[in-house]
């Protein structure tokens, strides 16, 4: 398991604001020796970002997210079903509020197009995911950990709407709707 979430948590506690933690091949300027649970966030309070951090065998760039007046500005968000409809507009609103947004959708091409429309790298990141499949969701979580080290907000918007009465659906159609 990656140290990225713990590194992100240390900087969040130290600086009082979210950061993005991404793998780096650059030379580290800060090295954590020993368990991260023993690192005092107070030792990082004066750290100027961006910084390259070595934690165990991993090296990360820790960079600031945008800051502003809104409470969610600078947060890292995930919107499932984010390629179209309500999800796309929620993603747009989060970007407009200053969030870095993962646009997650079963339609990978749609997610990529929406992420590019919202500003692309540094603002939005597409992820192809089937939220009804555990392995797909696990792969999404690994991608999020790799790219930013974690999340602050989750909008679980993905869903399936079927025409007709729920009373007339067969069991597999009903199960798929409720699994999502």
Set out the residue ranges of the language-model regions:
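Conserved glycine-rich Rossmann-like NAD(P)H-binding loop of the short-chain dehydrogenase/reductase
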Residues: 99-113
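The beta1-alpha1 cofactor-binding region of Rossmann-like NAD(H)/NADP(H)-dependent oxidoreductases
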Residues: 108-109, 128-139, 171
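Substrate-binding pocket helix/loop in short-chain dehydrogenase/reductase
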Residues: 165-166, 170-175
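Canonical Rossmann dinucleotide-binding motif of NAD(H)/NADP(H)-dependent dehydrogenases/reductases
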Residues: 70-102
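Conserved residues in the N-terminal Rossmann fold of short-chain dehydrogenase/reductase
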Residues: 103, 128, 179
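Conserved catalytic-site loops of classical short-chain dehydrogenases/reductases
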Residues: 76, 152-153, 175
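Rossmann-fold scaffold of SDR-type NAD(P)-dependent oxidoreductases
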Residues: 80, 151-158
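Glycine-rich flexible loops
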Residues: 1-77
